[in-house]
Amino acid sequence: MNFTGDCLLYAGYEKLSLSLAVVTILIFSSSLILNISALVIGFYTTAPGPMKMYLINLIVSDILFTVTLPLKIDYYYYFFNWRWGEMACRIMSFLSYINTYVSINFMTWISVNRYYAVTRPHKYNSRDNIMRTKIACACTWVIILVPMSSILFVSTTSSDHETKIRCMEYNKVGDSMYLPPWVTIVMCFIGFVIPFAMMAISYSAVCYTVLSGISKSTRSYRTCKLVACILTEFVICFLPYHASVISYMIHIITSKTVLCENVSYYQMLLHATQCLMKLNCCMDPIIYLFVSSYKSKAKSNSIKLMFK
């Protein structure tokens, strides 16, 4: 497999760059308001429990990533020109990957938690699960943080023929990957495909239990809706990006020559699908507010008033 050499990745994509900047501004504004609101409501209006712990961890991850979005807005506004130095690029990239895979893992934990709550209600005890939930949360952060921290120690910027500095992008096709394509595919399989399969199985079991009448409580129906919302968010936010990465890695493995225009298209596709991934920062707090709204009638009314 051969590469075509130096490549101007973004020739002709000026309008798309500005569109990405506008979309990211909207995501940043919405995410900041929603996540801070959800965090405040979470601390003051809901009792401790596994669901709260998972969702609070999601929100913390979203906030950490949201504060880096102004840098991404600047990058898009100046037509993919990074003006903030090497370390800022590393930190932004690090938090982006952390948010993606921490979110995927906690969304998977939530679905599994709901699976046991609905299909094994006699064995499920929220209080007994709190310690296990704490351990799961701690392990999730460690497992994601340790390998991703390598990003902080490698160069993440590069320059091209236009004398612009790119962040986490490469003007030479042959430099477009840190890892061999097959390793990237394996990582996508572990980080996305397996969690997606677990969520789909949990969702199917929950809905089967509820719709078959095995568990007829109102709470069970709400759980079915919750897991469906989480699965929908998962598909919208994370499936396009990982499908794009996997398909391109397969293209590299199977093709004798990778053309510049293919790489350019892939880079823009990554930016577009990454915008979809950023949407999870807005959707996570909405799901949290959805869950919190059922705790009591008074709390439900206060949450609804926020959105009038």
Swiss-Prot record:
Task: Could you list this entry's UniProt keywords, alphabetically sorted.
Answer: Disulfide bond, G-protein coupled receptor, Glycoprotein, Host cell membrane, Host membrane, Membrane, Receptor, Transducer, Transmembrane, Transmembrane helix
S-S bonds: 89-167
Instruction: List the InterPro entries.
Output: GP183-like (IPR047160), GPCR_Rhodpsn (IPR000276), GPCR_Rhodpsn_7TM (IPR017452)
The record lists the membrane-crossing segments as 21-41, 53-73, 92-112, 134-154, 181-201, 227-247, 271-291
Is Transmembrane helix among this UniProt entry's keywords?
Answer: yes
Q: Provide a Gene Ontology MF annotation, just one.
A: oxysterol binding
Gene Ontology CC, one term: membrane
Asked if the record carries the keyword Membrane, the reply is: yes
Cellular location(s):
Host cell membrane
Please list the residue ranges that the record places on the Extracellular side of the membrane. 1-20, 74-91, 155-180, 248-270
Q: Which stretches of this protein does UniProt put in the Cytoplasmic compartment?
A: 42-52, 113-133, 202-226, 292-308
Q: Specify the glycosylation sites in chain numbering.
A: 2, 262
Q: How does it sit in the membrane?
A: Multi-pass membrane protein
| Family from the record | Belongs to the G-protein coupled receptor 1 family.
This one is known as G-protein coupled receptor homolog FPV206
| Species for this entry | Fowlpox virus (strain NVSL) (FPV)
